[in-house]
């Protein structure tokens, strides 16, 4: 009996996984067991299952995640996406084809599609692994713990059925400016860290024009944005410290270590000798997600397109694919979109996916896996 991806998806969207993934992981394990596989859950909370062919061959991994961002949005089936009038989306309305709810596209729709391929693909040689992580939306401790030695990764995320071969990385940290505290009535006796924020912000603005990596062929220019600023302890005191939090969206070949060293040196050069600064990354258990780019002419990308995937393009958000791309060619693919013409979709109250796209994504990944492991 064929795997019922739409029934699985409907139940998955109705299973909250924004605070704790235990219930959703239990449902996934039960589904895998019911289909005759023997899943395991490792110490990092990853759900793993494997199928093997009759001969040696490549190892392909299907990966996505089961956690969602809060709050939980209830399940609903409808003919059109939320906030879209009949016919205005450019697709003919179909009764009940649109599933609304938190996680419907990010990433329970992609999960249903990957499960279809995992269960239904004919494997003649090599190995197919399903690896579903528990906390992609926060620290990616599950993905960071995986060591699968694969030859290719297909990562399930909402790409509108396009095959995404690249994505920017994301780093976050705080620039701390240190001055000299003094009475506000005698400002010349101190060195204001808050006043120094002005040239530092200018230096942040100029960083990519003078120091940063060149424009990437597909990902374009990196971005560097100050997002939070904080400083001062008393209203009548020259502040000795000011902190600026920055968000970095990187492109290859920039690395986490290289960016830190270059940014700190660049910003320091804009300060007078009476002040100093330092830059520290925000503390987290796992490495930040680095930028990656799989060649557009790689076998994995070509196979996905031949199977029916859409255009080759970058993915619009940071993803755990970053960890896997260090080891093997990696693409991001799945039903649903991050945003449509009417606004945000993933991580938003309007989150939805089309059931027909979930089915089509499953067909595409199944065909690609059969080509790679046939």
Q: What is the meaning of each model-derived region?
A:
Residues 174-374:
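Metal-dependent amide/peptide-bond hydrolase catalytic core
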């Amino acid at each position: 009996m064929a795997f019922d991806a739409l029934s699985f998806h409907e139940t998955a969207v109705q299973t909250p996984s924004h605070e704790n993934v235990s219930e959703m992981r239990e449902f996934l394990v039960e589904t895998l067991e019911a289909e005759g596989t023997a899943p395991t859950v490792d110490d990092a909370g990853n759900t793993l299952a494997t199928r093997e062919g009759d001969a040696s061959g490549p190892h392909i991994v299907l990966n996505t995640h089961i956690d969602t961002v809060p709050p939980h949005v209830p399940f609903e089936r409808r003919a059109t996406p939320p906030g879209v009038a009949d016919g205005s989306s450019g697709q003919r309305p179909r009764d009940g084809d649109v599933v609304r709810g938190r996680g419907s596209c990010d990433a329970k729709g992609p999960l249903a599609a990957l499960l279809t391929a995992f269960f239904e693909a004919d494997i003649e040689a090599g190995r197919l692994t399903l690896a579903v992580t528990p906390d992609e939306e926060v620290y990616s401790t599950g993905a960071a713990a995986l060591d699968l030695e694969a030859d290719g990764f297909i990562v399930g995320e909402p790409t509108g059925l396009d095959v995404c071969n690249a994505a920017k990385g994301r780093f976050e940290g705080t620039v701390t400016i240190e001055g000299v505290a003094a009475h506000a009535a005698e400002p010349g006796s101190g060195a204001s860290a808050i006043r120094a924020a002005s040239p530092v912000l200018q230096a942040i603005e100029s960083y990519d024009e003078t120091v940063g990596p060149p424009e990437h062929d597909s990902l374009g220019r990196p971005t560097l944005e100050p997002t939070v600023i904080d400083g001062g302890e008393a209203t009548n005191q020259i502040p000795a410290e000011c902190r600026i939090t920055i968000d970095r969206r990187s492109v290859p070949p920039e690395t986490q270590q290289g960016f830190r060293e270059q940014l700190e040196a660049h910003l320091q050069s804009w300060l007078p000798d009476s002040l100093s600064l330092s830059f520290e990354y925000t503390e987290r258990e796992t490495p930040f997600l680095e930028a990656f780019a799989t060649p557009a002419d790689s076998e994995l990308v070509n196979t996905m397109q031949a199977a029916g995937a859409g255009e080759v393009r970058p993915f619009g958000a940071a993803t755990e694919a970053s960890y896997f791309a260090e080891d093997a060619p990696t693409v991001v693919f799945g039903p649903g979109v991050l945003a449509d013409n009417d606004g945000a979709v993933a991580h938003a109250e309007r989150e939805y996916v089309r059931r027909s796209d979930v089915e089509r994504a499953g067909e595409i990944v199944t065909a690609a896996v059969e080509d790679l492991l046939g």
